Amino acid sequence: MFKGTPEIVTQRREEIVNACEELYQTKSFKEINLKEIGAVTSFSRPTIYNYFQTKEEIFLALYEREYDRWNAELESILNSGQNFSRKQVAEKIAMSLERRAQLLRLLSMNNFDMEANSREELLASFKRAYGRSLDLFRKILEKYCPEMSSEEVKEIMYVFFPFMFGIYPYAEVTDKQRKAMEEADVDYIYHSIFEITYNCLIRLLDR
């Protein structure tokens, strides 16, 4: 790791992650490499190795940042000061994920590669952000659904968080995939991230 001031290290890491995020808007995980990321930053590719050893570590940092952003939204729901109904809780959480399509994309498509090819300390940092999401989600259910037992809350979480892996592929369909579905005569109804998430949550909460 580069032995600069904490401010410089943070600034450089942020610039690298921002470059990765910019490329990820138009390219796939496999298409992006360190050379391309370096071309978007203000410094050379060798400098990147002072902060990240692999492409996957950069994506993991982006992934962690996406969880941090979602956590901020979950905190807002938790601390709203309002008494939400179960329907409103489902709507609020679904809308929070509607705004986090990039998080769901990373989760569904690149999760294994990022974790497998990153150093343990960076993976631990990411897991803390992920763990915060679990904690906030649990607290939201405990606050707005107080009649639920702790076991019921756990059961909902064990269903919903694995369910999140499949949201993006169902909601974000490419033109090629859509055309193939039409040619295969598959009667498929397309739904948004919000719709898919809400429909799952309202069924889990109203059991």
Question: What spans do the regions from the language model cover?
Answer:
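Helix-turn-helix
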Residues: 15, 30-57, 61
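Membrane-interface starts of transmembrane alpha-helices
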Residues: 145, 149-157
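N-terminal hydrophobic signal/anchor transmembrane helix of membrane proteins
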Residues: 70, 85-105, 190-207
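Hydrophobic alpha-helical connector segments
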Residues: 61, 75-103, 156-160
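Amphipathic alpha-helical segments used for helix-helix packing
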Residues: 99-121, 175-180
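C-terminal peripheral helix-coil segments that are non-catalytic and often amphipathic
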Residues: 135-139, 143, 147, 163-207
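Basic, helix-initiating cap at the start of DNA-binding domains
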Residues: 1-27, 35-36, 40, 79-81
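Alpha-helical DNA-contacting segments of helix-turn-helix folds
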Residues: 59-66, 115
